[in-house]
Amino acid sequence: MLGMLRWTTAGESHGQALVATVEHMPAGVPVTKDEVTYQLARRRLGYGRGARMKFEQDKLTFLTGIRHGLTLGSPISIVIGNSEWPKWTTIMSSDALDMEDPENVAAMSSGRGAKLTRPRPGHADFAGMLKYGFDDARNVLERSSARETAARVAAATVARSFLRETLGVEVLSHVVSIGRSEPYEGPTPTFADITAIDESPVRSFGKEAEASMITEIEAAKKSGDTLGGIVEVIVEGLPIGLGSHISGEDRLDAQLAAALMGIQAIKGVEIGDGFEEARRRGSEAHDEMVRDEDGVYRTTNRAGGLEGGMTNGETLRVRAAMKPISTVPRALKTVDMATGDAATGIHQRSDVCAVPAAGVVAEAMVALVLARAVLNKFGGDSLEETTCNIRCYLERIGKRLEFNDGE
């Protein structure tokens, strides 16, 4: 849609750089490299991350769209350089290689340059090789790698700043469970708890749940296996009316679900109590409304802050389920695409568990979708104009909920 907030990423896992582009962000939104660096560092958090996290440091460049720490309203480009690029210049070269050069022949015939012909079950390798006509799975896995999410986190840092400046809201996440660990079932955390969550080695908000998750990760390590889990994203303070009931594509819950399902390895999404709602009677499932001197509020929040595709003023709660990482140290059965013979899946440097990081990526996608919804509702070429539009809307909503008391 013309004028809609858009974000795209480019780049390969072992390429020269990843690039994040954000279009139609209003002018005047503050953005700093320190904030982007902070969010990228959060993405690397987590017990069970592999040694590659020590290598994949993030070198930032603001290429376009930002001047003196403020957005210009023009397309924003953020470049994340690959610190390991010198090791990959031949293997990932964009130029054709001279295969009469002995050095090129040596680089491409062994080690990391050798063709990868044994697709990993659960990964994009097999379908990607067939769909695009590749005889080397590297042409698939370089882009399908979760390393790409670093660019999304960078793009979302701009969206986070926009939400903070316009609505005063923050996006946070925590890990609910990992594998078969005992799930966290305590009170919903708030943004005031983010430091405690990030200091947890598994980004858990409960010590008992944390201990159970760590035990599960250690067991998976010992058995040469990998783990998935469930993360929850929480946003407090959203105004009533983001999204719409008018059409399916306008529904905010549909947009959030699509964005979260677009994260590598995510296999399920639920809003609020989600699938548990299907087990309840109608009298138990919905959030009743009451009114006091402060306005209308809900006695529960089973809907997770969304009804009819729109925010209803309650806390937004969205959960995403991540499957176990596809690169399993105890390699799984596959077929060698070069010979048709039985084989085991290729092994790439990987993690045992990336669920804590998935929460940060989920935050990023929720922030981007919410920023788009805010701009669709309130417009504005500048931060000042958008904020003014929001203020007028909130005043109108507030007056509507006064019900002409005293008149």
Curated annotation (Swiss-Prot):
So which domain of life are we looking at?
Answer: Bacteria
Can you supply a Gene Ontology BP term from the record?
chorismate biosynthetic process
**GO terms assigned for molecular function:** chorismate synthase activity; FMN binding
EC id: 4.2.3.5
* Annotated binding of NADP(+), by residue: 43, 49
Q: How is the cofactor bound?
A: Reduced FMN (FMNH(2)).
Q: Which cofactor does it need?
A: FMNH2
Q: Which residues cross the membrane?
A: none
In terms of HAMAP family, this protein maps to:
Chorismate_synth (MF_00300)
Q: What does this protein do?
A: This reaction introduces a second double bond into the aromatic ring system.
Subunit structure, briefly?
Homotetramer.
In Swiss-Prot or TrEMBL terms, this protein is called Chorismate synthase
Q: Which organism is it from?
A: Corynebacterium efficiens (strain DSM 44549 / YS-314 / AJ 12310 / JCM 11189 / NBRC 100395)
